[in-house]
């Protein structure tokens, strides 16, 4: 997909904003209390640390999956379900330092009887995560907003729901995506 200015600048801002927000929020994740204004100011310096002991500016699993989705969408004209699933599987195979439970359950494609990656992931997701309203699909969705900007509303919604269905098939998650 080719973007022209100012759309390119907007797309870059959306993607970088999501990644910076992820790195800032990582400091506050699992804090166990409501963050204070001082906590928020500190988080915006991207200090790292937190429960996950991240390096300064390091993104979490949410940011890593955002990048995996962005890479899968780069040259696609239609939502590439199988290619997206393979990018997600490549990511989970890299032994990431943190993975949300619903995401892990959906992406576990080990064992015999493999079908295509997206069918296996969607089957796992329906089996294990149908009742889950976790936010893992939403956390990686910024590339969808960029990629679907050229589509009509129905096509954009279908792409977002298809992506959510790979790991978070609950209808609330699909529509939130």
Regions found by a protein language model. Give the residues of each.
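Structured, active/binding-site neighborhoods that engage oxygen-rich ligands
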Residues: 1-177
């Amino acid at each position: 997909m080719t973007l022209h200015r100012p759309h390119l600048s907007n797309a870059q801002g959306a993607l970088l904003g999501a990644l910076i927000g992820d790195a800032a929020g990582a400091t506050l994740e699992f804090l166990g209390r409501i963050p204070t204004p001082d906590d928020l100011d500190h988080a915006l310096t991207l200090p790292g640390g937190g429960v996950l002991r991240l390096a300064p500016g390091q993104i979490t699993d949410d940011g890593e999956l955002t990048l995996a989705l962005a890479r899968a969408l780069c040259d696609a004209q239609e939502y590439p379900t199988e290619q997206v699933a393979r990018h997600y599987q490549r990511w989970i195979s890299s032994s990431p330092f943190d993975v949300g439970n619903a995401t892990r359950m959906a992406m576990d494609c080990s064992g015999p009887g493999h079908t295509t990656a997206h069918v296996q992931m969607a089957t796992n997701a329906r089996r294990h995560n149908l009742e889950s309203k976790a936010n893992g699909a939403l956390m990686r969705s910024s590339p969808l907003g960029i990629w679907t900007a050229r589509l009509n509303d129905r096509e954009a919604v279908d792409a977002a729901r298809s992506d959510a269905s790979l790991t978070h098939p609950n209808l609330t998650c699909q529509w939130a995506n």
